Structures are given as structure tokens and as C-alpha cells.
Amino acid sequence: MSHPSWLPPRSTGEPLGHVPARMETTHSFGTPSISVSTQQPPKKFAPVVAPKPKYNPYKQPGGEGDFLPPPPPPLEDPGTIPSGSGHFPPPPPLDEGAFIVQRGNPGGKTLEERRSSLDAEIDSLTSILADLECSSPYKPRAPPGSSSSIASPPVSTPVTGHKRMVIPQQPPLTATKKSATKPQAIPIPVTPIGTLKPQPQPVPASYSTASTSSRPAFNVQVKSAQPSTHYMTGSSSGQMYGPGSRSYNTQQVPLSAQCPPPTTCAGTDYAYIPPSGQQAESGFGYTSNQGRYFEPFFAACPSYGGRNEADPAYGQQVQPNTWKREPGYAAPGAGNQNQPGMYSVSGPKKTYITDPVSAPCAPPVQPKERLVKNQKVLQNVVDDRVHGLRKSGFPAPMGPPSVPPSFRPEDELEHLTKKMLYDMENPPADDYFGRCARCGENVVGEGTGCTAMDQVFHVDCFTCMVCDIKLRGQPFYAVEKKAYCEPCYINTLEQCSVCSKPIMERILRATGKAYHPHCFTCVMCHRSLDGIPFTVDACGLIHCIEDFHKKFAPRCSVCKEPIMPAPGQEETVRIVALDRDFHVHCYRCEDCGGLLSEGDNQGCYPLDGHILCKSCNSARIRVLTAKASTDL
């Protein structure tokens, strides 16, 4: 904002004083603003070319250890078939280092006690037939009754087993027979494939949750509370809960137990043979329940344990191409009578058995992300269990208190596991209504609780957060899941900067303060400024634009009115001459009323404080000169 200033005359020697005037443009005043929260698809396997059959040419006829395969297909020339009693060259001396065989347990049965004299003849015939079929990469399938048992041979005799190799993935690939040496070894508990974290004492328990048969179930491996118990539950020991669509199958699996094969196997043998550079070590080991699935309802959908291939489960061991699938033996005569969509503990099963690796590896540290993921999975299982109990008519289960936030991830995971087991084994009483959202205790008994904000409270716990008055049956205000009585809620509200009363409805914020919309007015005209431009003076008083100009804008020296911007304009134009302000239309000659401007003939020629044009100024000078000469 500019103030008028005096302008000195251009020259003192001129007979007529021409005073130039300057025009100033002032911008309008500023307008402050008003502010009024997978599973990955199954991993695909490439087709595996079946290796050529292996046999022992130095096996003596009548030896023990092999089974009789079916006869080869008929040939066109029967004369080319050699007789079974052909002579073979004498075997060279055996090299002790050529066969790496581990001795079995001293307390188990010997190989000679397990096999009959018929098996000895089968071994020699198998070697002869294998020589005839060396031109074909495939061998005919063995009859169902000639399945080999998982037994250990003596140290000096390698054993040739016959198994079919099937890639456990959809679509099914071509299955071929594979001979592999499986000497007996000391049973070593091995966890499934993944990152190894030794757990020497706790017994792993598998919790399988299945909603539908269209996708694999997820299993979480946790530690049991009884580390000294080692047993395998039978077909009737599995616990099933079926209020909802999910079922929970709890089994404890032994860490070290030699599984004797039965006389007849209910399932088909599947084995993945390690590469030729590695020696198969043991046919026995820890039978994990994570890889188990059941053919009656999930024949085309094998279970992947609820984890991705790139995300190993808790306590797994990383070693490629060292796992084998062995048959899971079912109880004889056990039928499957369960409902569809639920896992069964009886009937034919297929179990993944992981053989120990030959070279030991250092156990890496368990990643924290995996523990957090297992914690979330267990929490979801517990929530689903509680939801299923409520839908079936049972209240929420009573159990241990919630986990404090100061727990480590490992302790919190263990606590959630125990809480889930406790909730599943201890269904709540009929008069249980839930857990109080205020104190965390159970609400038991009629008339002891109330429901508010979609939560359950004790009657004594549902009080105002400020004055602790009981709010049952009383109106209250809910703010961020917290209850307030009406007086305390009003005291928590913002107060108007003008009337100092609490703002119950809409808040208008301006200049960093809160106002009622009807209290935010101009101090001059008292008009509401809600949604209207305004400005503030040096004292902080609020004005509308018109009243601010009327109060603080410069005034014209002729009409005494404030010089304001033209309608529709944002700038103020004024003329400053002789330390006075003029409107553009008020800057005229006082004698003739002619509009003055910057031109030579239309300029301002003041005389004795009067604004005159050039002609009027000359006329006044002549009058004054004549009067002065008369006086003399």
C-alpha cells in the first residue's frame, strides 16, 4: 500500500509550475483459504526318462534277495532265447569298496530269516531276464503280489529292488520300474525338504485344515508339549471336529521307530531314486504327516503342506534329489466312512519319507518371517475354530489369556499352538457369552454382560472412559471403540474461538482456529463468511474484502471515498499528485473541470495548492499579476 508523497517542481525558473502526477497500481489484498489393509500354484516337474535296468551279473543261481518279475513279451524267434541253466563266467573277486552297505540294527531280524527259498530262485531268473531286456529302457510291471519289502541285505550282497517311479504332480507322467540298492541303516529322524532346524526332543504334530477338495490343504508343523512320547496313532486315534466346513486331524508321529512292513501293502510303492553319484542310505526314517493325502477324496490333489516351494516349513532340511516317497500302511479292513470334504485317518494312504543325506550340513537360522507366517496361520485356524463353534450353537471356547505383546515370535507361536489345542479339547459352557473387550476375562452367566459396539462387556466393565459411570441402558457416544457419557463426550470436543462453546456439529477451521459456521462473520458487516473470501487485519480481526477496503484503502482527496478496485478487477488504480490520492475520474482541473492526464497540454499545473490545467493556471497568474501592479 503506497502513501502519497510530494513531488518537487521540475524547475524553479519556469514562469508556470507544471507538477507531474504519477499513477500507481496496487494489488488487491490476499485471500486466505478456509479449510472446512498364496498360495502359489503347484510346482511343475519335467518328465523323467527312466534309466536302464540294473542287474548283478555275478549273482549265483539260487541266491537270495530278488523277486521274480513277469516273463518278457514273446519274441519272433523262439530259438534266440537262452536256457535258464546257462553257464556264466566265474565272478571276479569282489572289491570291498565297490559296495557301500550300512549294517542294520543288531537287534533286528537277519535277511536269511525273512526270505524263503523261492526268493533265491527269483533272484537268478531276474538277472537272466534283465540281460535279455537290456535293449529296452522299460521293464514290464511286476505283479501286485510281488512287492518288495523294505529290508536290509547282508554286507556282501547288494539287493535289487523293484519300484515304480511316479512324479507326484498333475498331469501324471509315465511310470517306470527302477532298481535301487536299499541297505538297512540306523533310523535317523529327518524333517521334510527345506531349511533344517534340529529339534531333538519335541514330537512334531501336524494340523491339517481342509475346506474343499478343490485345493490342497495346508499343514503347519509345530512342537508338541510332551517331548518324551513316541507313538503312532491308529485309524481311530485321529480327532475330527466337524461343526463347520473345516476339520482338524491331530496325529503324533514317532521320531525314531522302525516300521516293519506288513505282509500285504494297501498302497502302491512309489520311490524317487537319488542320482547315481549318491548312495541310498536308509529305507526307514521319520514319517512326516505333512505330505500325506488320501486317495478316496483327494486322489488328484496332493497336499503341499500349506507352503510354497520357495518358503520352507519350520525345521526342514535343504537337500535336492534326496527324498523318497514310501507307502503309508493302512490298517487291514479299514473302510472310509467319513463325509466328503473331510480328511480321513483310515484307508489307503501315501506318505512321504525323507531319507537322510550322506553329508551333514550346518543348520541355518530359522527366519523370523517364517515364524510370523506360521503365527498368522495358527491364529487363522483358531479364529476359524471359534467361528465354527459359534455357528454350530457353541459359544466361544474358554482358554488361556491372550498373548502379551512382549513375547518373542517363537514363544507367541508356541502359545497360540497350545491355545488352539486347549480350545479344541475344552468346548465352552452353555452360559458363556464371549470374552470381555475391556478386561479380557470370560463373560459367563445370564445378566452379567452386555453387548455394545459389536463387542461383549461385563456390566461393571462397560463404563465411561473418563468418569467411570456405568453405561448399561444409558445413551453413550462411541469414539474409536471407546464409550463416553454425554457430558464427558461434550468436554472432549473442540470449542469455538468466538463463543467458546463446544462444537457439536460441523466445524469451520480458519487461521488455525475452530469456529461454528454461524460464528465466523465479518467484524464490520457481521455477515457470515462460510464459503466467502475474507482477509485478516493486523489485529487478527476477520473482514470481508469490501469492508477491509473501506476501512484501510486510501481515500480520494476530492470525493473522500476509498479507492477500491473496479468491479470484476483485482487491482486498485489511483493517481498520486501533490501528496494526495485521486480516483482516475476525480483527477480534474478545479476551475474548468477538465480531466487531467500525463500529456503536455492536459497536465497538472498547480497554483497555491489548487490543481489546475495549463490554461486555467495562466489565467490565475494574469489575474494575480494585474492585482499586484494595481496595489503598487
Curated annotation (Swiss-Prot):
Coiled-coil residues: none
Kindly indicate where the leader peptide sits in this chain: none
Q: Which GO terms describe its cellular component?
A: cytosol; focal adhesion; nucleus; plasma membrane; stress fiber
Residue ranges for the region (Disordered) are 1-118, 135-249
Give residue spans, biased composition: Low complexity. 41-53, 144-160
* Location of the protein in the cell: Nucleus; Cytoplasm; Cell junction
Q: Tell me one GO biological process term.
A: cell-cell adhesion
Position of the Glycyl lysine isopeptide (Lys-Gly) (interchain with G-Cter in SUMO1) cross-link? 324
Residue positions, PTM Omega-N-methylarginine: 246
Q: What SMART domains does the record tag this protein with?
A: LIM
Is Repeat set as a keyword in this record? yes
Q: At which residues is Phosphotyrosine found?
A: 241
A single MF term (Gene Ontology): metal ion binding
Matching Pfam families: LIM
Give the Polar residues compositional bias ranges: 26-40, 172-182, 206-239
- LIM zinc-binding domain mapped to chain residues: 434-493, 494-554, 555-623
| Keywords, alphabetical | Acetylation, Activator, Cell adhesion, Cell junction, Cytoplasm, Isopeptide bond, LIM domain, Metal-binding, Methylation, Nucleus, Phosphoprotein, Repeat, Ubl conjugation, Zinc
Q: Which residues carry this modification: N6-acetyllysine?
A: 109
Tell me the InterPro entries matching this sequence: Znf_LIM
Q: Which residues carry this modification: Phosphoserine?
A: 117, 152
Hey, which family's this protein in?
A: Belongs to the zyxin/ajuba family.
Its quaternary structure?
Interacts with PDZ domains of SCRIB, with VASP and with ACTN1/alpha-actinin.
Name the PANTHER family on file. LIPOMA-PREFERRED PARTNER, ZYX102 PROTEIN
The free-text function statement in the UniProt record for this protein reads: May play a structural role at sites of cell adhesion in maintaining cell shape and motility. In addition to these structural functions, it may also be implicated in signaling events and activation of gene transcription. May be involved in signal transduction from cell adhesion sites to the nucleus allowing successful integration of signals arising from soluble factors and cell-cell adhesion. Also suggested to serve as a scaffold protein upon which distinct protein complexes are assembled in the cytoplasm and in the nucleus.
Protein name according to UniProt: Lipoma-preferred partner homolog
User: What organism does the record attribute this protein to?
Assistant: Rattus norvegicus
Give the source lineage, highest ranks first. Eukaryota, Metazoa, Chordata, Craniata, Vertebrata
